[in-house]
């Protein structure tokens, strides 16, 4: 391990502040759009120890991580690890992180609503989209209590 003077309590990667005491894999998973599996893949590709605390990463290692996140295909990250394969508009495999991911998801939901697909209708009505039951769960509004019958 590096000396204590190289330790950072907060590390900023891809616009996200990460607690320096987390292991590298779990620290990277704090970034929206990066899960634990992709974080292990990043560590393996860049030769970073996944068990090392993220606060001990050098500036050069952080720069390489950010470069990989912005262009994963250049580092031979397999397409099944990316979170937006065969994009609706471009047809390319992409990996989105942070605010860009949130924007694209909202755009997808709006497109579903516009074409009035089943999923879009469910989103528009505020109901569950993925086939879950709705009879008893997911109820909104105030609860109506049951009163005991008076004699």
UniProtKB/Swiss-Prot annotation:
Coiled coil: none
Annotated function: Located at the top of the head of the 30S subunit, it contacts several helices of the 16S rRNA. In the 70S ribosome it contacts the 23S rRNA (bridge B1a) and protein L5 of the 50S subunit (bridge B1b), connecting the 2 subunits; these bridges are implicated in subunit movement.
Keyword Ribonucleoprotein: yes
PANTHER family recorded: 30S RIBOSOMAL PROTEIN S13/40S RIBOSOMAL PROTEIN S18 (PTHR10871), SMALL RIBOSOMAL SUBUNIT PROTEIN US13 (PTHR10871:SF3)
Protein's UniProt keywords contain Methyltransferase: no
UniProt xrefs under Gene3D superfamilies: 1.10.8.50, 30s ribosomal protein s13, domain 2
One protein family per Pfam: Ribosomal_S13
Protein name: Small ribosomal subunit protein uS13
Sequence similarity: Belongs to the universal ribosomal protein uS13 family.
Family annotation (PROSITE patterns): RIBOSOMAL_S13_1, RIBOSOMAL_S13_2
GO MF term list: rRNA binding; structural constituent of ribosome
